[in-house]
Protein backbone atom coordinates (compact mmCIF):
# COMPACT_ATOMS: atom_id res chain seq x y z
CA UNK A 1 0.00 0.00 0.00
CA UNK A 2 2.67 2.52 0.93
CA UNK A 3 5.11 2.09 -1.93
CA UNK A 4 4.69 3.89 -5.22
CA UNK A 5 5.86 0.72 -6.95
CA UNK A 6 6.02 -2.72 -5.40
CA UNK A 7 7.32 -6.16 -6.25
CA UNK A 8 8.11 -7.89 -2.98
CA UNK A 9 11.82 -7.85 -2.27
CA UNK A 10 13.85 -6.14 -4.96
CA UNK A 11 13.83 -2.99 -6.95
CA UNK A 12 15.41 -0.99 -9.72
CA UNK A 13 18.37 1.32 -9.73
CA UNK A 14 18.75 4.30 -12.03
CA UNK A 15 22.34 5.22 -12.86
CA UNK A 16 23.07 8.51 -14.56
CA UNK A 17 26.82 8.05 -14.88
CA UNK A 18 28.23 5.23 -17.01
CA UNK A 19 31.30 4.82 -14.80
CA UNK A 20 29.08 3.30 -12.08
CA UNK A 21 27.33 0.70 -14.24
CA UNK A 22 30.02 -1.97 -14.00
CA UNK A 23 30.31 -1.51 -10.21
CA UNK A 24 26.53 -1.84 -9.85
CA UNK A 25 26.50 -5.01 -11.96
CA UNK A 26 29.24 -6.57 -9.84
CA UNK A 27 27.47 -5.62 -6.63
CA UNK A 28 24.21 -7.12 -7.95
CA UNK A 29 25.94 -10.32 -9.14
CA UNK A 30 27.23 -11.34 -5.69
CA UNK A 31 30.54 -9.59 -6.26
CA UNK A 32 31.29 -11.37 -9.54
CA UNK A 33 31.80 -10.12 -13.08
CA UNK A 34 29.10 -12.51 -14.33
CA UNK A 35 27.41 -9.83 -16.48
CA UNK A 36 30.67 -9.26 -18.35
CA UNK A 37 30.90 -13.03 -18.91
CA UNK A 38 27.42 -13.16 -20.44
CA UNK A 39 28.34 -10.28 -22.76
CA UNK A 40 31.47 -12.19 -23.85
CA UNK A 41 33.83 -9.63 -22.31
CA UNK A 42 35.64 -12.21 -20.14
CA UNK A 43 36.31 -15.94 -20.69
CA UNK A 44 34.97 -16.91 -17.26
CA UNK A 45 33.51 -15.00 -14.39
CA UNK A 46 35.21 -14.54 -11.04
CA UNK A 47 34.61 -13.04 -7.66
CA UNK A 48 36.08 -9.54 -8.04
CA UNK A 49 34.55 -7.29 -5.37
CA UNK A 50 31.90 -6.90 -2.69
CA UNK A 51 28.41 -7.98 -3.61
CA UNK A 52 25.28 -9.73 -2.48
CA UNK A 53 22.33 -11.65 -3.85
CA UNK A 54 20.14 -8.82 -5.12
CA UNK A 55 18.61 -10.56 -8.12
CA UNK A 56 14.87 -11.04 -7.94
CA UNK A 57 12.85 -13.61 -9.83
CA UNK A 58 11.92 -12.90 -13.44
CA UNK A 59 8.26 -12.82 -12.42
CA UNK A 60 8.89 -10.14 -9.79
CA UNK A 61 11.05 -8.18 -12.23
CA UNK A 62 8.26 -8.30 -14.84
CA UNK A 63 5.75 -7.12 -12.24
CA UNK A 64 7.97 -4.13 -11.43
CA UNK A 65 8.73 -3.41 -15.08
CA UNK A 66 5.02 -3.09 -15.89
CA UNK A 67 4.71 -0.49 -13.13
CA UNK A 68 7.78 1.41 -14.29
CA UNK A 69 6.24 1.64 -17.77
CA UNK A 70 3.28 3.41 -16.10
CA UNK A 71 5.42 5.49 -13.73
CA UNK A 72 4.11 8.86 -14.94
CA UNK A 73 0.50 7.74 -14.55
CA UNK A 74 1.16 6.28 -11.10
CA UNK A 75 2.96 9.43 -9.94
CA UNK A 76 0.23 11.71 -11.30
CA UNK A 77 -2.45 9.68 -9.52
CA UNK A 78 -0.60 9.84 -6.22
CA UNK A 79 0.16 13.55 -6.62
CA UNK A 80 -3.55 14.23 -7.15
CA UNK A 81 -4.33 12.46 -3.87
CA UNK A 82 -1.48 14.27 -2.09
CA UNK A 83 -2.67 17.64 -3.41
CA UNK A 84 -6.26 16.88 -2.35
CA UNK A 85 -5.11 16.25 1.22
CA UNK A 86 -2.84 19.28 1.26
CA UNK A 87 -5.57 21.62 0.01
CA UNK A 88 -8.25 20.18 2.32
CA UNK A 89 -6.10 20.57 5.44
CA UNK A 90 -4.51 23.95 4.70
CA UNK A 91 -7.02 25.76 6.92
CA UNK A 92 -6.18 23.47 9.86
CA UNK A 93 -2.53 24.40 9.39
CA UNK A 94 -3.32 28.12 9.12
CA UNK A 95 -5.11 27.86 12.48
CA UNK A 96 -2.05 26.16 14.01
CA UNK A 97 -3.92 22.92 14.70
CA UNK A 98 -1.70 20.65 12.57
CA UNK A 99 1.44 20.92 10.46
CA UNK A 100 1.59 19.79 6.84
CA UNK A 101 4.52 18.60 4.72
CA UNK A 102 6.76 21.30 3.31
CA UNK A 103 8.09 20.95 -0.22
CA UNK A 104 10.99 23.38 -0.67
CA UNK A 105 10.78 25.78 -3.60
CA UNK A 106 12.35 24.34 -6.73
CA UNK A 107 11.85 20.76 -5.57
CA UNK A 108 9.47 18.08 -6.78
CA UNK A 109 8.27 14.94 -5.02
CA UNK A 110 6.63 11.66 -5.97
CA UNK A 111 3.86 11.69 -3.34
CA UNK A 112 5.26 8.63 -1.61
CA UNK A 113 3.26 9.52 1.49
CA UNK A 114 1.13 12.23 3.01
CA UNK A 115 1.46 13.00 6.69
CA UNK A 116 0.23 15.48 9.20
CA UNK A 117 1.90 16.47 12.44
CA UNK A 118 -0.39 16.71 15.43
CA UNK A 119 0.34 18.99 18.39
CA UNK A 120 1.63 16.12 20.53
CA UNK A 121 1.70 12.36 21.06
CA UNK A 122 -1.61 12.29 22.93
CA UNK A 123 -3.42 14.06 20.09
CA UNK A 124 -1.81 11.74 17.55
CA UNK A 125 -2.91 8.65 19.47
CA UNK A 126 -6.46 10.00 19.85
CA UNK A 127 -6.59 10.84 16.12
CA UNK A 128 -5.37 7.38 15.07
CA UNK A 129 -7.96 5.78 17.37
CA UNK A 130 -10.75 8.03 16.06
CA UNK A 131 -9.87 7.16 12.47
CA UNK A 132 -9.73 3.44 13.33
CA UNK A 133 -13.22 3.67 14.83
CA UNK A 134 -14.30 5.08 11.47
CA UNK A 135 -12.63 2.22 9.55
CA UNK A 136 -9.73 4.37 8.32
CA UNK A 137 -6.19 3.11 8.80
CA UNK A 138 -3.78 5.88 9.77
CA UNK A 139 -0.42 4.93 11.24
CA UNK A 140 2.56 6.59 12.84
CA UNK A 141 5.52 6.60 10.51
CA UNK A 142 8.78 5.81 12.20
CA UNK A 143 10.69 5.38 15.39
CA UNK A 144 13.93 7.39 15.32
CA UNK A 145 16.85 5.12 14.48
CA UNK A 146 18.99 6.41 17.33
CA UNK A 147 16.41 5.10 19.83
CA UNK A 148 16.13 1.62 18.25
CA UNK A 149 18.11 -1.20 19.94
CA UNK A 150 20.77 -1.23 17.20
CA UNK A 151 20.90 2.56 17.19
CA UNK A 152 21.57 2.59 20.92
CA UNK A 153 24.21 -0.12 20.54
CA UNK A 154 26.02 1.08 17.41
CA UNK A 155 25.00 4.67 16.76
CA UNK A 156 25.09 8.08 18.31
CA UNK A 157 23.04 11.25 18.19
CA UNK A 158 24.97 14.42 17.49
CA UNK A 159 23.55 17.64 18.86
CA UNK A 160 20.35 18.20 20.77
CA UNK A 161 17.28 16.14 19.87
CA UNK A 162 15.01 19.13 19.24
CA UNK A 163 13.13 17.72 16.26
CA UNK A 164 13.69 14.01 15.60
CA UNK A 165 11.93 12.45 18.58
CA UNK A 166 9.29 15.16 19.08
CA UNK A 167 8.36 15.06 15.39
CA UNK A 168 8.19 11.27 15.37
CA UNK A 169 5.73 11.51 18.27
CA UNK A 170 3.53 13.92 16.29
CA UNK A 171 3.64 12.46 12.80
CA UNK A 172 0.83 10.32 11.38
CA UNK A 173 0.46 8.96 7.85
CA UNK A 174 -2.81 9.13 5.99
CA UNK A 175 -3.97 6.50 3.49
CA UNK A 176 -2.04 6.93 0.24
CA UNK A 177 -2.22 4.34 -2.50
CA UNK A 178 -2.80 4.12 -6.22
CA UNK A 179 -6.44 4.50 -7.21
CA UNK A 180 -7.75 5.39 -3.78
CA UNK A 181 -11.50 5.64 -4.28
CA UNK A 182 -12.78 9.25 -4.35
CA UNK A 183 -15.38 8.41 -1.71
CA UNK A 184 -12.71 6.91 0.54
CA UNK A 185 -10.48 9.95 0.04
CA UNK A 186 -13.36 12.26 0.90
CA UNK A 187 -14.12 10.22 4.01
CA UNK A 188 -10.51 10.56 5.21
CA UNK A 189 -10.69 14.31 4.65
CA UNK A 190 -14.07 14.75 6.33
CA UNK A 191 -13.21 12.62 9.38
CA UNK A 192 -9.88 14.39 9.80
CA UNK A 193 -11.57 17.79 9.73
CA UNK A 194 -14.25 16.50 12.11
CA UNK A 195 -11.64 15.30 14.61
CA UNK A 196 -9.55 18.46 14.53
CA UNK A 197 -12.54 20.81 14.60
CA UNK A 198 -12.73 19.93 18.31
CA UNK A 199 -9.17 21.16 18.88
What does each of the following model-derived ranges do?
Residues 16-199:
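PLP-dependent aminotransferase class I/II
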Residues 8-13:
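Glycine-rich phosphate-binding loop of ATP-grasp-fold ATP-dependent ligases
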Amino acid sequence: ETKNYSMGEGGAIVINNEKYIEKAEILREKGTNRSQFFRGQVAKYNWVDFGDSYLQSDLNAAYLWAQLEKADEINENRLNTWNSYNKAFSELQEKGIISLPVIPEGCVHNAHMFYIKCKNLETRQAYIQFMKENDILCVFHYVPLHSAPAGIKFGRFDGKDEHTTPDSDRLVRLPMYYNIDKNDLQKVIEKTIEFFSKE
